[in-house]
Amino acid sequence: MNIDNNKAQMRKGILEYCILMILEKGDAYASTIISDLKDAEMIVVEGTLYPLLTRQKNQGLLTYRWEESPQGPPRKYYSLTEQGRDYLKELHQSW
């Protein structure tokens, strides 16, 4: 059994759960999600976050929309879908 692989899988699962919990509070863009995770003392970088967001979007757990930003290019805001809310409720019960 590869302990490093198990650690990576656990970390990924925890990050996915945390992302859903952040989005449960309201829509957010990637840098806000990273900031919230860092505030919770979780180490995460964009290269880790974007694949997780893409996977969760492909699973139907979240969606996104583009919004103009007064400080530069448009921002992609992520939000939970109903399926994502239901899935998060199941995760809350499991934890």
Where in the sequence are the language-model features?
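C-terminal regulatory/oligomerization modules of transcriptional regulators
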Residues: M1-M10, T63, E90-Q93
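Basic, amphipathic "hinge/linker" alpha-helix immediately C-terminal to the N-terminal HTH DNA-binding motif
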Residues: P70, P74-H92
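A cross-family signal for key residues in well-ordered alpha-helices
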Residues: C18-M21, T54, K89
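Basic amphipathic alpha-helical segments that dock to polyanions
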Residues: L49-P51, R55-Q56
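N-terminal helix-turn-helix DNA-binding core of bacterial DNA-binding proteins
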Residues: K7-T48, E67
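Short E/K-rich amphipathic alpha-helical oligomerization segments
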Residues: T63-S69
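Glycine-centered, phosphate/nucleic-acid-interacting loop/turn motifs that mediate DNA/RNA or nucleotide
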Residues: G60
